[in-house]
Amino acid sequence: MLTFIGLGLFDEYDISLKGLEAVREADLVYAEFYTSCLMGTNPEKMEKLYGKKVHLLSREDVEQQPDWLDKAKDKNVAFLTGGDTMVSTTHVDLRLRAEKLGIETHLIHGASIASAVSGLTGLQNYRFGKSASIPYPYESRRGAIIISETPYDTIKQNSELGLHTMIFLDIDKDKGYMTANHALELLLEVEKRRGEGIMERAVAVGIARAGSEKPVVKADYAESLKDFDFGNPLHILVVPGKLHFLEAEALVKLAAGPGKIMEETE
């Protein structure tokens, strides 16, 4: 059997009691932290709490050559992930592969950044549209620096519908954790190129270290927010669409947003 266990948002103590019990009962415990990771802990602390050895998997181990998956045919295997265990399509794909191999799968959910963002910002969860991810720029074969415009397009589409956009930020083994500041700079660079006024007038909300004792939540106009010090990772970014008056009040009072947004509500 293969049990997918979501570990929550920040440290080893965010795991549910049901999840902890499943880890302790497992024959083998694997974890991947390239789609998301817990910044408030490390494998040693996790192993101490669980009383189990945690085997760390690379992207290749999970997506290309999951040889370890065969062990779940006759053993009780736990697979640990940050956040909720089925938010990433990588994990859905892994579950489907396991089922095709005749391996029984089971899910134990964990706290998700999607629900945490709504709670921390006061933005209503049913008013979110399609989410986006901002990757690091890369250099083309001709030496040009390529910035993805897909996140900008997603924000534009959601904005036209009055919906909020949650933006996940890149985690790269060489470049590290993308900050909300860098993400805003990239969006504003695309704005500069295209001149459509999407980010020029947009309010944005940055969240850092959700799930910790002292998360940072700050709202402001994008041009100003890019200079705010969010501190250590992980960061996530939200670009709200049309704000309900309660959402605007929440951003002002809970995220130190500019009072002017109270005048721009529906």
From Swiss-Prot:
It catalyses: 2-[(3S)-amino-3-carboxypropyl]-L-histidyl-[translation elongation factor 2] + 3 S-adenosyl-L-methionine = diphthine-[translation elongation factor 2] + 3 S-adenosyl-L-homocysteine + 3 H(+). It holds the Pfam family TP_methylase. Pathway: Protein modification; peptidyl-diphthamide biosynthesis. S-adenosyl-L-methionine binds at L9, D84, V87, S112, I113, L169, A210, H235. Its EC number is 2.1.1.98. InterPro entries: 4pyrrol_Mease, 4pyrrol_Methylase_sf, 4pyrrole_Mease_sub1, 4pyrrole_Mease_sub2, Dphthn_synthase. It comes from the Archaea. S-adenosyl-L-methionine-dependent methyltransferase that catalyzes the trimethylation of the amino group of the modified target histidine residue in translation elongation factor 2 (EF-2), to form an intermediate called diphthine. The three successive methylation reactions represent the second step of diphthamide biosynthesis. HAMAP family: Diphthine_synth (MF_01084). Belongs to the diphthine synthase family. GO terms for molecular function: diphthine synthase activity. One of its GO terms (biological process) is methylation. It comes from Methanosarcina acetivorans (strain ATCC 35395 / DSM 2834 / JCM 12185 / C2A). Keywords: Methyltransferase, S-adenosyl-L-methionine, Transferase. This is Diphthine synthase. Homodimer.
